[in-house]
Amino acid sequence: MPTINQLVRKPRKSKVEKSKSPALNVGYNSLKRVPTNESAPQKRGVATRVGTMTPKKPNSALRKFARVRLSNLIEVTAYIPGIGHNLQEHSVVLLRGGRVKDLPGVRYHIVRGALDTAGVTDRKQGRSKYGTKKPKA
């Protein structure tokens, strides 16, 4: 255990917390072509590849994903939530953080109902998470 005098001379270092969605913590100045330290809650990007992947054991499915080039020129893999989607290559999408536990390397979600991504059709409950408008009564 250090003495008070030792702590005065050299204080304790606080732990550095690693980000769970690092691509959202980097901005980009396109005029100067340099990355910046601007963080953002969401980022816009262009889908470069849309496909399916299989989850880790013990799960079994075909999970929909998109490879997205963000506005800060970083390319990431993002999950497409909900049943059915209208995304294809060159679709403009909005990304948020949030990993998918059974897909290794997928740390981002695509926001449904924003930009080129349509909301989930015929959804009655939990509509706000899937970008679905209120149905006509």
UniProtKB/Swiss-Prot annotation:
Keywords: Methylation, Ribonucleoprotein, Ribosomal protein, RNA-binding, rRNA-binding, tRNA-binding
Gene3D superfamilies: Nucleic acid-binding proteins (2.40.50.140)
PROSITE patterns: RIBOSOMAL_S12 (PS00055)
Region named Disordered: 1-57
Modified positions (3-methylthioaspartic acid) in chain numbering: 102
Example of a GO MF term: rRNA binding
GO biological process, one term: translation
Keyword Membrane among record annotations: no
Domain of life: Bacteria
Cellular component, GO annotation: small ribosomal subunit
Family designation: Belongs to the universal ribosomal protein uS12 family.
Stated role: With S4 and S5 plays an important role in translational accuracy.
Quaternary structure (record): Part of the 30S ribosomal subunit. Contacts proteins S8 and S17. May interact with IF1 in the 30S initiation complex.
Protein name from the UniProt record: Small ribosomal subunit protein uS12
Gene behind the chain: rpsL
